Amino acid sequence: MNDNYMINPKKELSQCFIHSTDITDKIVNYAGNISNFSIIEIGPGLGTMTYSILKKNPKKLISIEKDSRLLPIHDKIIKKFQGKYEFILSDALDIDLRNIAKPPVKVIANLPYSIATLLLIKWINYINFFHSFTLMFQKEVADRIIAQPNNKNYGTLSILTQLFADVYKMQDFGPEIFSPKPKVFSSVINIVVLPQPRFDVNYDKLRKIVKITFNQRRKMIRSTLKQITNNTDEILHSLNIPNNLRPENLSIKQFCDIANCI
């Protein structure tokens, strides 16, 4: 694949290519058995991860890539793995993944960091479509996704993801595995979707409450909740939640309980 290296990564697309198949093989292995799954890859780049996925014989692999310069590389892969590989030239933010793959579905990707959080929030809206995600994030974002209450990283991403899934950090990686080398460390995490949400709650209402409270995370919840309801003190008292807590002190269940009272 040495000829592929002549493609210069585009900064505006957050392109950081992984060249080592040892690394991509390891990432794909974190996804477990994929032989009975449709796999979706976002930002396949030079195809290193693509080859690692196809070597494990998925039911089908569908890649979404925005950079048309990479099309010739993936045309070669399509010819080599006839019927197993589909390449879509598009922006992943514009695609509803339910329209391109048949369940069960796993997503395996080295996500473009500039849109990684936006993609995850988008997928959470129809998360029951997926079995799991094995994703490379900027380490700072990964730490937010897996964070627990009473941690400075705990926030909107933690709550909205963990309401629907178990989350695990698999491995941290330094900048040296990428070309060009980013200025940040990266982490691979597994997000394994639960059969049902942990708690029964109106998701849109929960998301609104979480967003408002964590936008002012240093304020006590009795203050920020007043932007949503006039019954803040009564609600907190009925739920035995001290009104001097900050949002990072509340569990996912407590946020759901509050949402169910509003």
From Swiss-Prot:
Reaction catalyzed: adenosine(1518)/adenosine(1519) in 16S rRNA + 4 S-adenosyl-L-methionine = N(6)-dimethyladenosine(1518)/N(6)-dimethyladenosine(1519) in 16S rRNA + 4 S-adenosyl-L-homocysteine + 4 H(+)
Using the UniProt record, give the first listed, main subcellular location.
cytoplasm
Per UniProt, the enzyme's principal EC class comes to transferase
Q: What does this protein do?
A: Specifically dimethylates two adjacent adenosines (A1518 and A1519) in the loop of a conserved hairpin near the 3'-end of 16S rRNA in the 30S particle. May play a critical role in biogenesis of 30S subunits.
- Signal sequence, renumbered to the chain: none
Q: Which organism is it from?
A: Ehrlichia ruminantium (strain Welgevonden)
On whether Zinc is a keyword of this UniProt record, the answer is no
Name of this protein: Ribosomal RNA small subunit methyltransferase A
Q: Which domain of life is it from?
A: Bacteria
Q: Which family does it belong to?
A: Belongs to the class I-like SAM-binding methyltransferase superfamily. rRNA adenine N(6)-methyltransferase family. RsmA subfamily.
Q: Which Gene3D superfamilies match?
A: Ribosomal RNA adenine dimethylase-like, domain 2, Vaccinia Virus protein VP39
